[in-house]
């Protein structure tokens, strides 16, 4: 009986692995969604990617993005087909949560028509027509990984097609050259803070000034009812700087964590 059980488990494990494309594998940074299968996989030692930082469209035959990140480097791209009992939204939410728990800095997050054209994201950005579906059924996230992988970008895109098949695209680009300063939009920061309850901004400088300070001020001004706990080695300095920019002291508390960068916890 024990031998039969071991054989059955072995067959099950082999079947699960056999469903994946030969030679494919998950990204180290991103756990696989349960029962998802890799149906497309590609690695390239050097490839250029242009990732949107805003809605994507085509005007007069030209591709237009509200913002973009352009980088070249080692690319690993894979497409998961999701099990029919789970939605693409569930898989996307799981991926988003995993990346933020790894202290990745969010650069852009959109859903539905806010992303722009699904056809352009599928074909012009990711080069995979399998990812084309209704604009209302898509979601997209771009993050920058924390040190020592600060020159790596991870993009995640989910879609439920018209035939109800759901897919999740995940790819990591390890840039050949150091990435410049990359900032998320205030709307993306606020949306992620509310969705996850917390955020770690690992690329925030120790000295609160310049573009990061302006970004956090604009983020907190989008919803004046939001209160946050600030943690990190320089949280006190950031709180003082935000207060100096007009953010009410009553909206900010200090936490105990001594993490690198700045950690925000939503106080509800």
From Swiss-Prot:
Coiled coil: none annotated. The keyword Repressor does not apply. Disulfide bonds join 110-115. This is Uncharacterized protein PA1624. InterPro entries: DUF4892 (IPR032608). Residues 24-184 are annotated as: Domain 1. Was identified as a potential drug target. Residues 185-268 are annotated as: Domain 2. Pfam families: DUF4892. Residues 1-18 form the signal peptide. It is found in: Periplasm. Keywords: Disulfide bond, Periplasm, Signal. Monomer.
């Amino acid at each position: 009986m024990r031998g039969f059980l071991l054989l059955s488990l072995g067959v099950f494990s082999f079947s699960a692995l056999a469903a994946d494309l030969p030679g494919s594998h998950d990204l180290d940074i991103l756990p696989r969604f349960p029962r998802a299968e890799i149906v497309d996989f590609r690695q390239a030692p050097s490839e250029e990617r242009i990732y949107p930082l805003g809605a994507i469209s085509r005007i007069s035959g030209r591709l237009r993005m509200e913002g973009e990140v352009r980088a070249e480097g080692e690319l690993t791209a894979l497409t998961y087909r999701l099990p029919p009992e789970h939605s693409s939204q569930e898989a996307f939410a799981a991926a988003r949560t995993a990346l933020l728990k790894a202290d990745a800095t969010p650069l852009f997050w959109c859903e539905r028509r806010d992303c722009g054209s699904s056809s352009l994201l599928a074909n012009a950005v990711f080069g995979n027509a399998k990812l084309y579906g209704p604009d209302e059924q898509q979601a997209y996230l771009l993050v920058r990984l924390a040190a020592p992988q600060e020159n790596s970008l991870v993009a995640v895109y989910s879609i439920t097609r018209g035939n109800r098949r759901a897919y999740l695209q995940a790819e990591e680009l390890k840039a050949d050259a150091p990435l410049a300063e990359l900032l998320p939009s205030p709307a993306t920061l606020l949306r992620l803070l509310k969705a996850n309850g917390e955020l770690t901004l690992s690329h925030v400088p120790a000295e609160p000034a310049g573009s990061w300070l302006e970004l956090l001020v604009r983020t907190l001004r989008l919803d004046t009812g939001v209160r946050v706990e600030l943690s990190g080695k320089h949280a006190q300095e950031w709180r003082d700087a935000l207060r100096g920019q007009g953010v009410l002291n009553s909206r900010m508390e200090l936490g105990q964590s001594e993490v690198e960068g700045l950690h925000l916890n939503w106080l509800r």
